Amino acid sequence: MNKQSWLLNLSLLKTHPAFRAVFLARFISIVSLGLLGVAVPVQIQMMTHSTWQVGLSVTLTGGAMFVGLMVGGVLADRYERKKVILLARGTCGIGFIGLCLNALLPEPSLLAIYLLGLWDGFFASLGVTALLAATPALVGRENLMQAGALTMLTVRLGSVISPMIGGLLLATGGVAWNYGLAAAGTFITLLPLLSLPALPPPPQPREHPLKSLLAGFRFLLASPLVGGIALLGGLLTMASAVRVLYPALADNWQMSAAEIGFLYAAIPLGAAIGALTSGKLAHSARPGLLMLLSTLGSFLAIGLFGLMPMWILGVVCLALFGWLSAVSSLLQYTMLQTQTPEAMLGRINGLWTAQNVTGDAIGAALLGGLGAMMTPVASASASGFGLLIIGVLLLLVLVELRRFRQTPPQVTASDS
């Protein structure tokens, strides 16, 4: 493949067996988690007939994920990362078995579902942080953009396939099948992960875990480059919460039930296109400026989305947001890995991922509040243009990020 091609280079899967193992394990894991994501809300709704109870389970799991990301960041910088990944995956699978056994009971326990949701949310995020911290060692820092794009494609593809499989399983066999196959898939991921090389953390002095986590916070706040990247990531995630307005906007556009699906598919489709056409991103001389501009463009797309007179134009705006946000996210991921010291990778990746979780929750809450005071169209536009104003201010304030220059990575024969 020509080094100037816009298309994503897949050669990393051929030349790096360890990354290929992670790629396979991640895809199976995404599908397994998707089966779980369909089953839990359906089971709780069937048991309680309460959307509040369903929302509570999501909130509890999200809180456990946040704690797991914090703890996982400290563990990934302190212990052998392969062991942390395997321990987290195996322990998570045990929780899925618990959900399966609970579903088979004559009267399943709602409390057990909540507790196992906490268990799985914590251990799933624990492994995510360790895997992110280990990626530079697996592929080399010069290949991080390519690895990030392949990972994004894996997540998007798995996120499309798994709900469809989960829905079919619910219709034919019930929630126990979803939980059982999620557990089986999780344990299957251990097979490729066992082939990973040892991934020891860099040597560093022992300190109290809280002190270690605070050191990560201090580094994030003290570094205008890494801190700016994390801030942009949080704002971008807030913008993606616009999906909570889809049902109301669909009524405004008088969309049919089948047409509403296009709204939900638009952002993942745009993001997949962004990942597939990311071939030149790694060769950008000014990735910080490109990140800022693509983020601003994504905010503008959300601002225009609700103003479109026809739903098909709204779908185009969402797809544009997906593409631009994919570009920004890939640049964020690559710069975060390359500009963070090896000894801090676990904690900084944990904090970066955690702000994605909290940014989505904050964005959904703000849009819900705006929706109570404004029309859906006004809410969507206000969120997009409000974030655009903040983004313009950050473009002026984040001088180091805006001016950051890098030497494009050399392309080897295996990449061409």
Swiss-Prot record:
Record flagged with keyword Transmembrane helix: yes
A molecular-function term among this protein's GO annotations: enterobactin transmembrane transporter activity
Periplasmic side: 43-55, 105-109, 178, 240-256, 308-313, 378
Cytoplasmic-side positions: 1-21, 77-83, 131-156, 200-218, 278-287, 337-356, 400-416
Record field: transmembrane: 22-42, 56-76, 84-104, 110-130, 157-177, 179-199, 219-239, 257-277, 288-307, 314-336, 357-377, 379-399
Pfam family, one: MFS_3
CC per GO annotation: plasma membrane
SUPFAM superfamilies noted in UniProt: MFS general substrate transporter
Compartments where found: Cell inner membrane
Membrane topology: Multi-pass membrane protein
InterPro entries: Enterobactin_exp_EntS (IPR023722), MFS_dom (IPR020846), MFS_trans_sf (IPR036259), TM_effector (IPR010290)
Keywords attached to this entry: Cell inner membrane, Cell membrane, Membrane, Transmembrane, Transmembrane helix, Transport
PANTHER family in the cross-refs: ENTEROBACTIN EXPORTER ENTS, INTEGRAL MEMBRANE EFFLUX PROTEIN-RELATED
Biological role stated in the UniProt entry: Component of an export pathway for enterobactin.
Family membership noted in the UniProt record: Belongs to the major facilitator superfamily. EntS (TC 2.A.1.38) family.
Protein name: Enterobactin exporter EntS
